[in-house]
């Protein structure tokens, strides 16, 4: 659990004018499902959960689970909103308060990839994790062949720590994973 002087991620993290990370709510379920459904082919390439998200009810259930995790201090899920529209999601998939570490995950709709949105949102979430939550280590894990996500980690100055064999089952095959991390002192000393 968080210490008394830290708080879980705030409900809204302003990234820049018009771009924000907004804590997901049950009221977002329909919009989230519509974006997921419209981008199913694109997202399926790297995300293993698409076959379990086939209705708004599935999305409601997923959001309910993430809100429970948030309440326990175990994680957080944000809608990535650009000019008010939901264009993707970013999450703290896990928070280890004892070791002061966390892991990030994200996805964007097809038309919003390649514009630096995920990178800028990661920077804002890292700032919050290090500055406000007092975390020490920030982890990003991506399939070894997911070059766009790996490039984000590298742009952020994260260190490649491991390649893990057969890390994740992706519908009909295993994929290897690249594990990147950066510590708070490394983050502060970059550039």
How should these model regions be labeled?
Residues 46, 50, 73-77, 136:
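Short, polar/charged, Gly/Pro-enriched helix-capping and turn/loop motifs at alpha-helix termini
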Residues 26, 37, 53-60, 74:
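Generic alpha-helical scaffold signal
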Residues 61, 65, 124-127:
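Generic recognition of well-ordered alpha-helical segments
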Residues 44-64:
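Conserved GNAT-fold acetyl-CoA-binding loop/helix
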Residues 37-40, 51, 67:
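Residue-level detector of secondary-structure transition/capping positions
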Residues 1-31, 35-42, 77-191:
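Acyl-donor (CoA/ACP) binding surface of acyl/acetyltransferases
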Residues 53, 64-79:
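A short helix-loop-beta-strand connector motif used in the catalytic cores of GNAT acetyltransferases and
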């Amino acid at each position: 659990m968080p210490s008394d002087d830290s708080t879980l991620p705030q409900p809204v993290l302003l990234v820049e004018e018009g771009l924000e990370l907004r804590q997901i709510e049950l009221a977002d379920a329909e919009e989230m499902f519509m974006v997921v459904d419209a981008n199913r082919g694109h997202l399926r390439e790297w995300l293993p959960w698409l076959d379990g998200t086939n209705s708004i009810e599935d999305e409601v259930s997923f959001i309910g689970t993430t809100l429970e995790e948030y309440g326990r201090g175990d994680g957080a899920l944000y809608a990535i909103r650009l000019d008010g529209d939901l264009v993707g999601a970013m999450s703290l998939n896990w928070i280890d308060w004892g070791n002061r570490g966390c892991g990030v995950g994200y996805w964007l709709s097809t038309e919003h990839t390649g514009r630096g949105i995920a990178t800028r949102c990661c920077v804002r979430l890292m700032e919050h994790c290090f500055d406000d939550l007092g975390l020490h280590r920030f982890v990003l894990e991506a399939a070894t062949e997911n070059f766009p996500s790996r490039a984000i980690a590298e742009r952020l100055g994260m260190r490649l720590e491991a390649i893990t064999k057969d890390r994740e089952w992706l519908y009909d095959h295993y994929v290897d994973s690249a594990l990147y991390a950066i510590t708070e002192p490394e983050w502060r000393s970059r550039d």
